[in-house]
Amino acid sequence: MIFRSFALSLNKISCTRKNIQVNLLIFRSFALSLQTKAYIMKKTYRITLAVIALFILATIGGSVYMLNFSLSPDPNHTDLDSTYAILYKHFPDMKPWVDSMQTNGYLRDTFLTMPTGERHHALYFRADSAKGRTAVLVHGYKDCAAKFLYLGRMYNRDLGYNVVMPDLHAHGLSEGNDIQMGWKDRLDIKRWTEMAAETFRDSVYGVNIVVHGVSMGAATTMSLSGEELPAYVTHFIEDCGYTSAWDEFAVQLKAQFSLPQFPLMYTTSLLCRIVHGWSFGECSPIKQVAKCQRPMFFIHGDADDFVPFYMMQQVYDAKTHGKKAMWVTKGTTHASSYADYPKEYTERVRQFLAE
């Protein structure tokens, strides 16, 4: 009995030791599992941080690239020989007219010093029968005044207007380091209307001014239209302008790079505000048009996919005060309405200004 009891006790001790060993194994396994999970979580955390950091760096890099791509001026923007060559290629009959204007001293250059201290350039010429009627003509993105002399000829030769054709900031012979998409340009054009009034005011008829812009020049014109202006600025004509810098850049981001608006549009707009003092959303011709109370003529080609045709209806609808007119040029691509319909363009502008 004593032996059996002793043996039974040994068995119990043995079982207890085995249970302890099993429990130790379970504990070690659990501890190892916790260590493995901690390692995996730590690694996942590091990978997540790395991915976030890469995303942020890529977004910043993309924003810097997009801003430079969009707002850096043409490095050859002062090369007027190339500019005139392009003008004559598209409008061969312009060369004799330009040569005559230059030879006789009618086509002149002038400069204004802007509040920033930068000197801006413009071409100007008068019409003997103008009676104070003057057109301030605004060119497009990465273009210059000389390339739009076809429009200057229309106003001067066909409509009898004095003409002022500014080079926008960082375009043509105007100083500057960045393209302003028409936003800050609106205030520069306001200065040019003041110059035009001083230069061409008639002693009998006074002066009245139409501001006419194409593409980015049209966006500039619409942006100007919402400002407080002297009474002598009487009419506006916008040819294929965009609703806002945001909308136009979003269209090009998708068309050229197949990218959505988020996140680049948001970060690049913020960067633009930091670097240049304005944001893509702030540059909003459509909001300015909503404040315009003077007559405006809207022109757009229905085959325009650079500044999409649907934007015309949006800016037209936004103008709820004062007279307005619309002309859709059939089959016309971006900024080509005059080239496709020169006679009708001239007559429609004449009719609008006469109303």
Locate predicted features.
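Acidic catalytic loop of the alpha/beta-hydrolase fold
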Residues: 303-307, 335
